[in-house]
Amino acid sequence: MPQNEYIELHRKRYGYRLDYHEKKRKKESREAHERSKKAKKMIGLKAKLYHKQRHAEKIQMKKTIKMHEKRNTKQKNDEKTPQGAVPAYLLDREGQSRAKVLSNMIKQKRKEKAGKWEVPLPKVRAQGETEVLKVIRTGKRKKKAWKRMVTKVCFVGDGFTRKPPKYERFIRPMGLRFKKAHVTHPELKATFCLPILGVKKNPSSPLYTTLGVITKGTVIEVNVSELGLVTQGGKVIWGKYAQVTNNPENDGCINAVLLV
């Protein structure tokens, strides 16, 4: 045996300490926290180099994870389906039948048809991310810039619970949260102040829809139960869609036209 390998020799003779594996596991668990602490305290060129190294490590790790996932998922065989008599359990195993393609196309067309409305404002100006979301700098040295504050009017439901402020990425100020909208019925030519039920679609971005941001052209759902509208079957209509026609952040109120 080579010199200076006395620890390995001792382990071969007498085995490991009883708490060795537990201590090793705990040390490995602490390592992530220690690296994080080290990264926070570092400044200057040393910090830049360290972050670059960590960035490269993370990319490599993500690539490895992706490779493992690819290996585990079953790949679809695009080869032609064998001609002739095929047992029932092998039918539709490989390749796509023409009927399946047609069925999917019809389903897709139905979805598209269902998603279209005749709206008062068919085209509106897109709202950029810099316009809607203001960057909030945080951290000891105000270096972190992952938080965003919504600068437009938004709707937040009654069941919404805030995350702890430290972990909240999108901040929606109380002053910009609206609960009611002035909705005009195009046939009755009358305006009603109705409670908002939710934001159906913001034309600028799906992110704004999930955040409940209300800008010009947004389709919102309003409670029309007090209007007394009924269906052909005699049931009271509870909610209906309306499109916002003004800029609520400038006017201080939401004006919308009911989609009938």
From Swiss-Prot:
Belongs to the eukaryotic ribosomal protein eS8 family. Ribosome biogenesis protein NSA2 subfamily. Involved in the biogenesis of the 60S ribosomal subunit. May play a part in the quality control of pre-60S particles. GO terms for cellular component: nucleolus; preribosome, large subunit precursor. It comes from Homo sapiens. This is Ribosome biogenesis protein NSA2 homolog. It is found in: Nucleus, Nucleolus. One of its GO terms (molecular function) is RNA binding. Its main location: nucleus. Pfam families: Ribosomal_S8e. The modification Phosphothreonine is found at residue 81. CDD domains: NSA2. A motif (Nuclear localization signal) lies at residues 11-18. It comes from the Eukaryota. GO terms for biological process: maturation of 5.8S rRNA; maturation of LSU-rRNA. Keywords: Isopeptide bond, Nucleus, Phosphoprotein, Ribonucleoprotein, Ribosome biogenesis, rRNA processing, Ubl conjugation. Component of the pre-66S ribosomal particle. There is a cross-link at residue 80 (Glycyl lysine isopeptide (Lys-Gly) (interchain with G-Cter in SUMO2)). Residues 20-34 have a biased composition (Basic and acidic residues). The keyword Ubl conjugation applies. Residues 20-41 are annotated as: Disordered.
